[in-house]
Amino acid sequence: FYELTPDLRVAEQVKLNRTDWLLYVNYFGICGHASADALSRFGPERVILDHSQAFFTAPPDCLATIYSPRKFFGLPDGGLLVTQLPVPRPQETDTDSVGRMKHLLQRLDGSPEAGFPDYRAAEETLADFRPRSMSVLTRKLFASYDMEAARARRNGNFKQLHDLLGKRNSVPLALGDVDGPLGYPYGGKRPELRRALIARRVFVPSYWTEVLGRAERQSVEEYWVTSVLALPCDQRYGDEEMKEMAGLVQSLEESR
């Protein structure tokens, strides 16, 4: 593991040994310049880019790029690998996708809280790391989405949240790096803001909680895990939802 700078670049003191590779995450899909910096510093042949939060960012010339479309669309499973390495295609195809669909259907039915136990159960089935090809069901669902419409809506929602909350946000954001982001990273003033939003049915996910077991107190890594909220800005929502959420954030932060 290595340390990050406040703007999520690889810390200057990080050096690679001769046989090392570097895995860099494009956090929230807003780290285009930081990714380019990692490729320049360490060489594209030694860098693997994790685009699990940056679905709409094209894969650059590097060792490999990993994608997780299920973080962006209603898919039960499946990932994508882009690489020039001679990686053989899996001989086995995933056949368990139907069993992982229940929580997605419950969300469509308007009751995401009721589906949380099924979501946890579905996640546990993905702990099997045997390489398998994407299931037929997931492929068909994936092909049914309008990717460009989703990208445009995410960009519009992100910009609207930034217009409404940017002056309050402690996270420095470069809008030129943003293209189809996972969420809007918001650094708030109140540590209980996440719980308050969830209590009002605004789902704010927690990412990288395992980092707290190894990060130093008051480090950049601890700050991003505990204090930065990934406000939802995906294609399920529009202008009114963004206004309502921004107003709720402002109200909660100003209340005592």
How would you describe each model-predicted region?
Residues 23, 88-256:
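PLP-dependent aminotransferase class I/II
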Residues 59-70, 244, 249-252:
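A short alpha/beta connector and helix-capping loop motif
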Residues 8-14, 33, 56-61, 74-78, ...:
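Short, charged, surface-exposed secondary-structure boundary motifs
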Residues 1-51:
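PLP-dependent aminotransferase-like
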Residues 3-9, 27, 52-54, 69-73, ...:
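Short, acidic/turn-prone active-site loops that include or flank metal/cofactor-
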Residues 62-107:
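Active-site PLP attachment segment
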Residues 50-58, 188-191:
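Short, polar loop motifs at secondary-structure junctions
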